[in-house]
Swiss-Prot record:
It comes from the Eukaryota. GO terms for cellular component: cell projection; plasma membrane. Disulfide bonds join 92-169. It is found in: Cell projection, Rhabdomere membrane. Belongs to the G-protein coupled receptor 1 family. Opsin subfamily. The keyword Transmembrane applies. Keywords: Cell membrane, Cell projection, Chromophore, Disulfide bond, G-protein coupled receptor, Glycoprotein, Membrane, Phosphoprotein, Photoreceptor protein, Receptor, Retinal protein, Sensory transduction, Transducer, Transmembrane, Transmembrane helix, Vision. GO terms for biological process: phototransduction; visual perception. Residues 44-55, 116-134, 205-245 are cytoplasmic. This is Rhodopsin. It is a multi-pass membrane protein. The keyword Disulfide bond applies. Residues 1-18, 79-92, 156-182, 268-278 are extracellular.
Length: 301
């Protein structure tokens, strides 16, 4: 109780119907996420032709999503059943740390996947191909930097506290001291605004490159007096473009998933009167959905 901010005491308990609904949602998404990401990891690791440097990033994305749901799913089921957090203050902090860690790792893995698509499509043969060593270094940097950021609240830079709905835990966005808020400013930049800027930059040039390629193909076809010009190289480029579209779709879905979390943090800092315990649930709903559809998009592609 000592970890719960006074802001939440002004609200009555949530409607009891919210808990079984949330439990059913978590059961559904938990099973789909764990099964989908496990299959993705198993297929990529046991199919030799798929063990490429680029696909190491896809496997890492599946691993981060799998770990997120593996660590979030059981505690959420327990808290929804009891209508409150019953796992103690220490596990509350561990729960929040693991959720932030896997989310941050997922975000930056998506960024590196996008950058790899940019390197393949925009730079083409002029770009340096992704090697297994480079992909491994990218993955290592993702986990090291994510751990560094997410472990900071254990040392007093912000704190991990129960959410207002008492079914989960996260960063403290209600404390007004500059130390706590500075963490949220920098962390929001690191896990949201910077990845968004990099992603937009990459896809602007990807779209330009695809448009220029298609225009060149049409112009060449006109000169040769034929309807279309599609050789083997063009088909390969077209396949790469389809992969880029799949990646773009996944990134867009990811930002839809994580924007509610950002808004909850910033509303909590600057307009807390608008933030009720029910609203904080939406951050869970959208974030957990992201871990479900990532393996679907990448497994198909």
């Amino acid at each position: 109780l000592h970890m719960i901010h006074l802001h939440w005491y002004q609200y009555p308990p949530m409607n009891p119907m919210m808990y079984p609904l949330l439990l059913i949602f978590m059961l559904f998404t938990g099973i789909l996420c764990l099964a989908g990401n496990f299959v993705t990891i198993w297929v990529f690791m046991n199919t030799k032709s798929l063990r490429t440097p680029a696909n190491l990033l896809v496997v890492n994305l599946a691993m981060s999503d799998f770990l997120m749901m593996f660590t979030m799913f059981p505690p959420m089921m327990v808290t929804c059943y009891y209508h409150t957090w019953t796992l103690g203050p220490t596990f509350c902090q561990v729960y929040a740390f693991l959720g932030n860690l896997c989310g941050c790792a997922s975000i930056w893995t998506m960024v590196f996947i996008t950058f790899d698509r940019y390197n393949v499509i925009v730079k083409g043969v002029a770009g340096e191909p992704l090697s297994t060593k480079k992909a491994s270094l990218w993955i290592l940097s993702v986990w090291v930097l994510s751990t560094a950021w997410c472990i900071a609240p254990f040392f007093g830079w912000n704190h991990y506290v129960p959410e207002g709905n008492l079914t989960g835990c996260g960063t403290d966005y209600l404390s007004e001291d500059i130390l706590s808020r500075s963490y949220l400013y920098i962390y929001s930049t690191w896990v949201y605004f910077l990845p968004l800027a990099i992603t937009i930059y990459c896809y602007v040039f990807i779209i330009k490159a695809v448009a220029a390629h298609e225009k060149g193909m049409r112009d060449q076809a006109k000169k040769m007096g034929i309807k279309s010009l599609r050789n083997e190289e063009a088909q390969k480029t077209s396949a790469e473009c389809r992969l880029a579209k799949n990646a773009m779709t996944t990134v867009a879905l990811w930002f839809i998933a994580w924007t509610p979390c950002l808004l909850i943090n910033w509303v909590g800092m600057f307009a807390r009167s608008y933030l009720s315990p029910v609203y904080t649930i939406w951050g869970y709903v959208f974030a957990k959905a992201n871990a479900v559809y990532n393996p679907i998009v990448y497994a198909i592609s």
